[in-house]
Structure formats: C-alpha cells, structure tokens
Amino acid sequence: MESTLRRTYPHHTWHLVNEGDSGAFVYRLTGHGPELYAKIAPRTPENSAFHLDGEADRLDWLARHGISVPRVVERGADDTTAWLVTEAVPGAAASEEWPEDERAAVVDAIAEMARTLHELPVSECPFDRRLDVTGEARHNVREGLVDLDDLQEEPAGWTGDQLLAELDLTRPEKEDLVVCHGDLCPNNVLLDPETHRITGLIDVGRLRLATCHADLALAARELAIDEDPWFGPAYAERFLERYGAHHVDQEKMAFYQLLDEFF
C-alpha cells in the first residue's frame, strides 16, 4: 500500500517520522505544495489510537466545531491497510525546549486549549470513552500489549495483574463527561512561536467523551516529568491552576494516569 500511496504523491519527498510498535508508520511529505503528513497502519490496529478512519472522522468533527486541526486530504483502506493524509499544521510543539521567559505562556495556552475542548457540546459528540475503556485495558494485558518495561515511576516493576487490580481498586464511581482529546500531551499541542497562541491539535485518534481528568492527568504528568526538564512540577501545578483547580480531583488524576499505562 505504501508504494501505491507514494505514486499518488510523486513530487513529494517522504521522510519517516515515526514507526510505531503497532505497525503504524508516519511520514512527513515535503517539496511540492503544502507540507503533508501520511499515516499508514493496519486496518484493524492493536492500538485504538491508530484507527485511521476513526481519526479522520474526529478531525472532521473538530474542524466543524471550530477547533484548528489538520485538514484531511485523503483517507482510505484496502483489505489489510488504512491510510490518512493530512495537511501539516503550522506551529511549534508545546513540548519543545522553550526559553525560560516563555514557558508560563506555553503552559497557559495548553490549559486554555483544554478548557476550549472541554466546553464543546457533549450532546453533539459521537465518540465515547467512558469507564468501559477498562475493558480495553484488560484486553491489552491478556494480549501482552502492555509495555511493562516502560511504566511510570510509581507502578514500575508491577505485573499486568497488579496493574489491573489497582485499576479496579481506584476506579471512580461516576464521570462528568466532556469532550476529551484522549492524549493531551504537550507534543500534541501546536503553538505560534511568536504569540504563543494555539495553532492546532494533532493525533486526535483517541478523542472521545470522558471525564476532564483523562486529559488533565496526562498533560500534568508530562509537564512534571524529568524527561522535559525545562518544565517540571511547578509548571504542572500552573497548568492545573490555569485550567481551574476547583475542577481537579487528585484521586481521579491518579486513576487516569494509571489507565494510560495500558495503552
């Protein structure tokens, strides 16, 4: 399929951006017309975030609701493979090493984007990610799809069964639903380097109805961890304050950070 798609864009140079464990490939296409991105993945992927037809539906839905996202150029599938081609969104990822005097503005922009997304009309969102997502977690443990060597610090060294037991123990009784990105990490938020205004959201394949904590937990964790030392715990706290600290339940935050270990 990749060779066929390359023939559709013969004047572009293809640059491999990412090769995922689930068999998905991401390419950046340059050199002719607007810069494009092409995703190629199994038609029925192990990772739900690489269900490309679903991601295309989400991109179209977000665009209709005023959210800046990549424009879908082409989507399709054959018996075994799916593909999605989109226009690149201008801007720099919020995860980049911003100058110290700009970092607060970057974090504030992520919080503003989260609020904007969470204020979209729930009744109009056809994508659902309620607590039954724990069923997907169990499936991933059974099928050996959870990378137990890449767990965060607190559950490091746990078995899949231990993770599931903790998930059951800490599962919230109810959810207040909003429209969630599903993977609201700084690298999926793009900003204008000059104004620090949001230019777009990318990698929206996990966008669904869920509690706001599903997004807040991942964004705060990524801002706090040492892998991006130009941010850190103080900026994670700033993000939550800017979003609205009165909305934040630390137990739910911990649950959704744990849930992410399964995906």
Swiss-Prot record:
Cysteine pairs bridged by disulfides in the record: none
Q: Which Gene3D superfamilies match?
A: 3.90.1200.10, Phosphorylase Kinase, domain 1
Give the record's keywords alphabetically.
Antibiotic resistance, ATP-binding, Kinase, Nucleotide-binding, Transferase
Keyword Transport included in the entry's annotation: no
Q: What is its EC number?
A: 2.7.1.95
What are the catalytic residues?
Answer: 183
Which InterPro entries does the annotation name?
Answer: AGP_Transferase, Aminoglycoside_PTrfase, Kan/Strep_kinase, Kinase-like_dom_sf
Reaction(s) catalysed by this chain's protein: kanamycin A + ATP = kanamycin 3'-phosphate + ADP + H(+)
Q: Which GO terms describe its molecular function?
A: ATP binding; kanamycin kinase activity
Q: Which domain of life is it from?
A: Bacteria
Under the heading Pfam families, the entry gives: APH
Q: Any stretches that span the bilayer, and where are they?
A: none
Query: Per the UniProt entry, what are the Gene Ontology biological process annotations, in alphabetical order?
Result: response to antibiotic
Q: Which family does it belong to?
A: Belongs to the aminoglycoside phosphotransferase family.
Question: What this chain does, per the record?
Answer: Resistance to kanamycin and structurally-related aminoglycosides, including amikacin.
The entry's protein name is Aminoglycoside 3'-phosphotransferase
Origin species: Streptomyces ribosidificus
Lineage of the native species? Bacteria, Bacillati, Actinomycetota, Actinomycetes, Kitasatosporales
